[in-house]
Each structure stands twice: as C-alpha cells, then as structure tokens.
Curated annotation (Swiss-Prot):
Its biological purpose: Catalyzes the condensation reaction of fatty acid synthesis by the addition to an acyl acceptor of two carbons from malonyl-ACP. Catalyzes the first condensation reaction which initiates fatty acid synthesis and may therefore play a role in governing the total rate of fatty acid production. Possesses both acetoacetyl-ACP synthase and acetyl transacylase activities. Its substrate specificity determines the biosynthesis of branched-chain and/or straight-chain of fatty acids.
Protein name: Beta-ketoacyl-[acyl-carrier-protein] synthase III
Entry's EC annotation: 2.3.1.180
ACP-binding as annotated region, ranges: 251-255
List of catalytic residues: C113, H250, N280
Subunit structure: Homodimer.
GO cellular component, one term: cytoplasm
Organism lineage string: Bacteria, Pseudomonadati, Pseudomonadota, Alphaproteobacteria, Hyphomicrobiales
Length: 323
C-alpha cells in the first residue's frame, strides 16, 4: 500500500523578536503573568515586507533544501492559514509562483489552529489516492495583523511564522511499523464558533476584523477534545500511548499541553514544547515545533510521532505518523 512519508522539513520566522518585557510596554501585563498562565516567553512579529506568503516561501525553500529537492519535483502545494495575503488568490498559489513552480496545483486550507493537521490529512489522501506523488504542506500565519493590541488577554498569546513538510509516496506493508502517515482523525463542531473568532470578513463587514476569544471556554473544552481525538487515533492504528516516541501538540498554551499529556499518560520528556519560543502561531505551530525537534536530533527516523491541534470553529484533530 502507499504511505505518505516525510521527505523534508523547514521553518521560517520573522526578524523581530518581541519578549514579554517588550509586551509590558504595549499593554498592562507582566512577564510573570504571561509565563505562569501560558508558558510563553517571547514571540516573533512580522515587519514591513514580511507576509504569510513570504514566510511560507522561506519555510518551503528550507524544506526543499532539507529534502534535496527543487520545486520541479513537487506535484502540489497545500497551505494552511487563516491570515492570507489576499482574499484571493490563495496563498498557496502565491507561494507556488514565488518558487517558480508553474505545473501541478495549489490551494489553501482554513481550519485556524488545526489547519496543519487538516492539511497533512488532505495531502495524505491525495497521495494515497494516486493524484500526487510529492506534496509540499505549509502552515504559515501572521496573526499579529489580526490582533487587538489593546486586549491583553489575547495580544500576548500569538506570534507569526511558518513551517513546512514535504510528503512523498512510499511503499508500505499496511502495518503500523511502516514509515509515513499511519492514520488521522479530524473533528469540528460549529456550535462553538463564537468562542474563538475574528469579527470581520469580505461578505459580512467588508473588513479584516480582529481576534476575539473566550479564553476560559476554550480552555474548558480543549483538554477533553484533544485527548478524545488522540485516543481515537491510537485505536485506529492499534497502538497505545506507551508506543509513542513524541507528542507534537499545537503550541497554544503550556497548561493545555501539559494537561492533555497527563490525561493521556504521556511522559513530559516525550512532549515537544516550543510555545515559550514562538507563542501561538496557529497553523504554523506544529511544523515549527517539528522543525525544532527534528533539527536538533530529538525526532529521528522510525520514531512514532503524534501531531494534534484544536482551533476556532471548534476544529480539532490528530495525525499519527512514523518519521
């Protein structure tokens, strides 16, 4: 059977680092308050000339270099983002052009913080279906452009960045010892749409809008939803938490990350945490974390890795893969 195997990874961050001390100059907050409640110590903020597409392009080029490939070797591009450069065309098409790729096809996926999990699942379906052999999957965001910088409960949480994976078709046996994507589980429930949203859009207000979040409500649902979908993914692959080498969660909040891992019985040393470095970068957070952990040698070939995320909608999901 065909498996979608990781061929390369890459990441990109804006030039500007904004620490919690810097944030103290913007809103009424403190480093201690932010760290205790979120685990965040700094975030990267896009500057002039830095956009979702430009960051996505940089991450894509890093992934291609890591894989020893060029854009000519790709069949398709999927970009997960909630902060596109334009309403249309898609950011993926923009990046396709920036890479000099004039064949194949490209499109965006929008599932907010769950976007990268949705995008990897989509790429896997195209590969297993024989539509594409090699897919560039990017998560890229500039959430700093949709924040209310007077709201201390939200503006301290988010940052900008991009990460990418290249998935390619490989032969598998059908066993859970195969390399590549083993299984995935996706969920959504629009009944929660008003708990995390942006108050603008082309067809409603004609404006971009800013982010609003009912933080306590999101936290109340997060751990349960995340652990349920991870357990379903384990069951589908006939593995347990004990078999897992790495949990790579969406980097939203350290308390959510720790709470989910504890409920699942996953040891802290098996959890990749980068929220202190990047803040919440929405769809970019998982590929950024993967780039850090694979880049420093923690994640190695053959490791069993769980990706998980929850975002506005609510949307949530998990992907189990063998690196």
């Amino acid at each position: 059977m065909i498996r979608s195997v990781v061929r390369g990874f890459g990441a990109a961050l804006p030039k500007r680092v904004m620490t919690n001390r810097d944030m103290e100059q913007v809103v009424d907050t403190s480093d201690d308050w932010i760290v205790q409640r979120t685990g965040i110590r700094q975030r990267y903020i896009a500057g002039e000339g830095e956009t979702t597409a430009s960051l996505g392009e940089q991450a894509a080029r890093a992934a291609l270099a890591n894989a020893g490939l060029t854009a000519d070797d790709l069949d398709m591009i999927i970009v997960a983002t909630s902060t596109p450069d334009n309403t249309f065309p898609a950011t993926a098409v923009n990046i396709q052009n920036r890479l000099g790729m004039h064949h194949g096809f490209a499109f965006d996926v929008q599932a907010v913080c769950s976007g990268f999990v949705y995008a990897v699942t989509t790429a896997d379906a195209y590969i297993r279906g024989g539509v594409a052999k090699r897919v560039l999957v990017i998560g890229a965001e500039t959430f700093s452009r949709i924040l209310d910088w007077t709201d201390r409960t939200t503006c301290v949480l988010f940052g900008d960045g991009a990460g990418a994976l290249i998935l390619e078709a490989g032969e598998g046996t059908g066993a859970n010892t195969d390399r590549g994507v083993l299984t995935a589980s996706l969920r959504s429930d629009g009944a929660h749409k008003d708990k995390l949203y942006v108050d603008g859009g082309p067809s409603s207000t004609g404006t971009v809008g800013v982010l609003h979040m009912a933080g306590r409500e999101v936290f109340k649902h997060a751990v349960g939803m995340i652990t349920d979908v991870i357990e379903a993914t384990f069951k589908a692959a006939d593995v347990t938490a004990d078999d897992l080498d790495w949990l790579v969660p969406h980097q939203a909040n350290r308390r959510i990350i720790d709470g989910s891992a504890k409920k699942l019985g996953i040891a802290p040393e098996k959890v990749v945490v980068t929220v202190d470095l990047h803040g919440n970068t929405s769809a970019a957070s998982i590929p950024l974390a993967l780039a850090v952990a694979a880049g420093d040698g923690r994640i190695k070939r053959g490791d069993l890795v769980m990706l998980e995320a929850m975002g506005g909608g609510f949307t949530w999901g998990a992907v189990l893969l063998r690196w």
